[in-house]
Amino acid sequence: MTPAPNMPASSFAQKARDFVDRLWNADDKTLRWILGALVVVLACFNFVRDLDNPAHAFWDESYYLTTTQRYEEGKAQYASHPPLGFMFMDAGIKTGKMFGINKNVDTHFLGDVKKIDSRVVPKGYDFTPIRMPSALFAVISALLFYLIILRLNGEAFEAFVFSLLFVFENAYIVHFRAAHLDSYQFTFTLGSILVWLYTFGREPKRPLLTYAAFGLLCGLSFMVKVNSLVMFLLGALSLGRALWLDHSRPNWLRQFWRGSSIAGAFLAVVTLIFTLHVVFNPNAPDTKTKAGARDNGAMGQVYKDYLAHKRDLSPAVVWDATVGYYKYMKYDFTGEVKTEPNGSQPVLWPFMAKAITYRWDFDGKKTAYTHMLGNPINWGLGLVGIAAAAVLISRRRFDRKETPDAEARTVDFDRLEALFAMFMVFWVFHIYLGIHRVMYIYHYFIGLALSYLLAALCFRILARQIPLVNRHRFSILCGLSVLIAASYLFYAPLTYHQYMTKTECNWRNIPVTLVVCQPAKKKPAALPAKPSPSLNKS
């Protein structure tokens, strides 16, 4: 029988439907692996490609290029943040040189100052090595985000769709593809949330190891940026809930040892990182340079004696170096400005206030932007998640009727309340910080992730309570994934430093202004003769 002319098209459509049907009806374990791998592939494509664009330092890279140069030379130093993130950057640079990248580029002068002008970069410098570790950590974060939602909702396809909130989040992409610290902090924070889910409302198989893993991940996150300390609240919620349900003396003793394992692991990793920082940088700072003079002024005598080879490495040396590091960070914090044109009010962060243009370049006809703008669809869903969580938690207090799925419903609501409490504490804590120093929208990244988790969990609860939502769950999830991806693609030129005309830029300002389209002036600012001093933005 001769096939009709349109048979190939219909055959392809049928094959596509069959594939989707097999995927949807695959056994749960297979589907989890397939979709988890797809999340990693998408994250690699979004975060790891074209890392040398723009081929200029932007935002805090102006600080971190100088910090990593001193790491490369093994010079003792202090910074505005703990040392772990800089160690990862240094590892990326050294790995790059193993492959010949930047091997013949003279970068020595970068270590003489604490900050360079973003346009004063060695000729031929490739940014891929210093940015690669951050991008790879972002890929790990994508997988962790998928696993967290899988743990919350228990369904692979649902976890995959909501993990797109991370994979296609333009704000995460533009910031995590750069040589910034936030990707490392974010990865360890997500790891701590995943481990916490194995402790909250259930008995772990190896409780002391599980709680210790939570403390270790909190410690790693803290050793990138200190505001991660607020995540300890999750561990406190697990311990507090266990004590609330069982007041017996044996249970108090169990929770004491679990809390001790959290604290012990945290202190162990902090001690280890500071020890490595001392060991990796055995050379005294060059006091003839601005950076060296500033670092030397913050160092204690015991640490100076070690650097001068007058004493061996010992706990006293590590302690003195750590105390000096703390004093340096504290001084930097108290010296922060409280307002700045790119700064934002933490109370407005859930509304994406406000985006930052890290850099723009004009070629005479078109302009390329590195613009820290979020995916509006994602942020809208995050805002819905926060509001829905507040409403559902309030209704729970008045809705005590028994249902066939009462046990699963209780677990979902307990997790929702814990995550909502964590979000509120994180948000209020940063509102408080905003009184004392300038804050930026990327400081909200952990809170944004928590809002996405709230949205995913609220969807699960609503699907269980509302039959209409449950019947059309697949269609709703497919529609969400299309909207998320389409919004990401629309704003991608601002994310990836792609050249656009001013008209194309203005399209991104409909219906509200999200980016100031450049050039606003005909001539760019002149290159300064020497780096201009500035306060740390991080």
Annotated model-derived regions:
Residues M1-N46, V161, Q255-V269, D412-E417, ...:
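Start-transfer (signal-anchor) and selected internal transmembrane alpha helices
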Residues T2-P3, A9-A13, R17, L237, ...:
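Transmembrane helical bundles and short interhelical boundary loops of multi-pass, membrane-embedded
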Residues A37, V41, D117-V120, G124, ...:
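Transmembrane-helix motifs of polytopic, lipid-linked glycan transferases
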Residues V40-A43, F162-V167, V174, L194, ...:
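Short helix- or helix-capping micro-motifs
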Residues F58-W59, A171-Q185, V224-N227:
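Short acidic/glycine- and proline-prone juxtamembrane loop motifs at membrane-interface regions
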Residues T66, E73-A135, K338-G343, P350, ...:
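Interfacial juxtamembrane loops and adjacent helix segments
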Residues I101-D117, V121, F145-F168, E203-L209:
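Transmembrane-helix signature of polytopic, membrane-embedded enzymes
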Residues L150-N153, S192-T210, S221, G240-R249:
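Membrane-interface transmembrane helices that cradle and orient dolichyl/undecaprenyl
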